Amino acid sequence: DFAVGLSRQLHGLTMHSERPGHRMYEQYHPLGVVGIISAFNFPVAVWCWNTALAWICGDVCIWKPSEKTPLCGVACQNIWAEVAKENDLPEGISCLVNGDFTVGEFLTQDERIPLVSATGSTRMGRIVGQKVASRFGKSLLELGGNNAIIVSDKADLKITIIGALFGAVGTCGQRCTSTRRLIIHDSIYEEVTSKLANAY
């Protein structure tokens, strides 16, 4: 939905100039090829989020899924191929390359790929960001976080315990938005920790 909404907003801007009889305007142009490196968790969602935005902006995508989820990549690519064929879209709008980290390195170093979007660990993001920056490319990095929940003395503890527990262990904790720590008001600390321990 966000990508479809964005498609109606890619019209550029026209501005007045301080020079009489002149106007300034900006235009949006496709980058060309977007490289997508996704992690093992949420492989389909991450691919969809990235490709939808790239396609709306007129770009084509090369997707390198995690070596732990290659079949997700193959399945998505097959579904996309059917959709593209049914709608008379040319081949090559979406490409798939499976392999280990060396395949990702090729994407980060290839100057024909102006933008690389990578989802994964902070360590991986640091490597990808530096390699892409060294060739003056652009990178979008969604990396592992250290997310906190702040629990005030006025918090609804029933909802807080459910949210904290699900945030920490939902999907086995294998997501970048997992709750890693709680910041609890002193006056309710004992009550919250006791309820949380019992919830486990």
Residue ranges and their predicted role:
Residues 6, 37, 100, 119, ...:
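Conserved residues at the C-terminal ends of beta-strands
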Residues 28, 45-48, 70, 74, ...:
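Glycine-rich phosphate-binding loop at the start of an alpha helix
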Residues 48-104:
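PLP-dependent aminotransferase-like
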Residues 23-24, 95-114:
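A structured beta-alpha segment of the ubiquitous adenosine-cofactor-binding alpha/beta core
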Residues 42, 68-71, 101-103, 122-123, ...:
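Short alpha-helical
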Residues 1-51, 86-89, 93-97:
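N-terminal Rossmann NAD(P)-binding subdomain characteristic of aldehyde/semialdehyde dehydrogenases
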Residues 82, 109, 115, 123-200:
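ALDH superfamily catalytic-core signature
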